[in-house]
């Protein structure tokens, strides 16, 4: 019996993170499905990714920023859940270690949807999507 592949939605991405999967692996799996399954894109981002534990707030916010950027690139409607203020971090999150020039580069090159959520990623996070 053949099992059909089910693409990983934003909601399922957060569920995997909550279950203990390395967050970067879950995030990359979501990005791969976005990249290689264009016919599924609207379904991938339709549901708001819930979180209950404080340490998962960063990942939910990262997903919101990611969805906003990816939908804008593809001229798809951005889901309303991405504008929920709960997806904005109170404290800055720098995705790369470093201070001084590194942080300066991150602040200058991070796309708006990430910066608006206080996530400083630089401009390379989504380069393969």
Regions found by a protein language model. Give the residues of each.
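Charged, helix-prone or intrinsically disordered regulatory segments positioned adjacent to compact structured domains
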Residues: 2-77
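Charge-dense, extended regions
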Residues: 70-129
């Amino acid at each position: 019996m053949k099992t059909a592949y089910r693409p990983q939605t934003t909601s399922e991405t957060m569920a995997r993170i909550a279950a203990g999967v390395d967050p970067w692996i879950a995030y990359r799996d979501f990005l791969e499905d976005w990249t290689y399954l264009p016919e599924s894109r609207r379904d991938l981002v339709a549901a708001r990714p819930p979180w209950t534990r404080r340490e998962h707030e960063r990942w939910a916010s990262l997903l919101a920023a990611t969805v906003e950027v990816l939908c804008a690139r593809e001229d798809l409607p951005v889901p309303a859940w991405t504008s929920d203020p709960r997806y904005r971090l109170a404290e800055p999150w720098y995705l790369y270690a470093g201070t001084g020039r590194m942080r300066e580069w991150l602040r200058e090159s991070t796309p708006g949807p990430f910066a608006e959520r206080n996530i400083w990623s630089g401009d390379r996070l989504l380069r393969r999507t």
